[in-house]
Amino acid sequence: MPRYKESMFNRVVHDGSKMIIFNSLTGPAGIRYVSESAQKKLDDWEKDNFESIDYDSTVFKDFLKCGFLVPTPCDEKELRDYYITKYMTSPRLHLVVHTTRNCNFRCTYCYMNHKNERISKDAQDGIINYIRKNIHRYMSVHISWFGGEPLMEMGAIEYISKEVIDICSKASRPYTSSVTTNGYYLTPKNIETLLKCKVRNFHLTIDGTKETHDKQRVLIDGSPTFDRIIENLLYIKNDVPTRALAVSIRTNMTKQHESTLSSYYDFYNCLFGDDGRFSLQVKPVADYGGDRVKAIENDLLPNMCCIYDSLSKLNGKIKFYWNMQDLSIGSSVCPSRMHNKYTIGCDGSVHKCDEDVGEIGEKPIGHLYSDGTMKLDEVACAKWCYVRHREQCDNCFFSMNCFMEGCPKVRVYRNENVCDIDFEEVDSLIAWAAKELNVETI
């Protein structure tokens, strides 16, 4: 019996004349170009079922290192189950806290029904008291501030953070925090406060250049927002010395962005390319419901292939780290499947899906009371966290990335378990990642 075999998680992509290998277990770190001589050796090994491998050769060691070859006794499906269980039962408490349903923006594609609703004092106390009562159950705590526009309620962020930081410090548990914001209120004063609250990861959206952004992401009265956001980011770059923070600038792409990709990249590379704390991320504008997106449905991209192909031809210092991480193990898995992840609504309602809060037909899984008691419907929780093995996914190379499931909300609400992976798009991303990461050649 041969000692090694090809991994079931392998993918071979051809970018012109170049052969690229990818493995969804080793992720971006395992991407390699394969030289013609290495291809020939691999072909020869395949012909005799890997009986003639030269175990001392550099080529063999490289294939082994990137995960393309694995020991024959390795049960990779069993290994996948192990990683799924490990992910689902993470000992970290992750709370996504909606500080408000309100927003100062009216983006053309937003699915949310904005309401003048802010997080109640009972909900704030509930978060604090829940963590105080249960901190012994968790190895660490992470709070993601969400909305609406979360920075419209800085007082709530300060109040909760101060108490939770103290609780975690006394219990010797690490505490981390992030915020998803439109960037308009990311002012010098608020930045100072957020850093004191241990917010270190900032996720904000700027839709390309000034021209495209100010068409898609405007204030309630229709006023532009681009210049104000860039001003805030330049303050972080020039006046915030700490290196212990990361700013991810997301751009939601439509067909209108295709012709401006070069100027888009040059603009951000020029401003932030020399500061490693800043990175870019591109995602397609998607139809998550609501009436606004219907007005631009003809501008929605069928997939991101053309965007990835164009960006792969550009060179600069600023990187697309988050897009590269889309190829990492478990990166396509929705956090709602995790046992210890909860989304807290303004009224203390407990959800699994971040997009479910305050929407018509929402299905909370429980409620968080001011004394820290979290009453959960365990039947509802089970629907979100249930690990369902889909036969059609069992042998898929990408199953270490998605853990064999699409959107849990679709499964829970519609009783459908549909694969939403576009494999042509994945191949384009692999080819782009090989260039972006400047990977080695075997």
Regions found by a protein language model. Name each.
Residues E211-I230, L234-R337, C346-D347, K363:
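Radical SAM enzyme [4Fe-4S]-AdoMet core and its adjacent flexible, acidic
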Residues E6-Y33, D56-V96:
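N-terminal [4Fe-4S]-dependent radical SAM core
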Residues E78-E192, C197-R200:
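Conserved alpha-helical substructure of the radical SAM core
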Residues C110-D122, I360, M400-A431:
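Iron-sulfur (Fe-S) cluster-binding segments and ferredoxin-like electron-carrier domains
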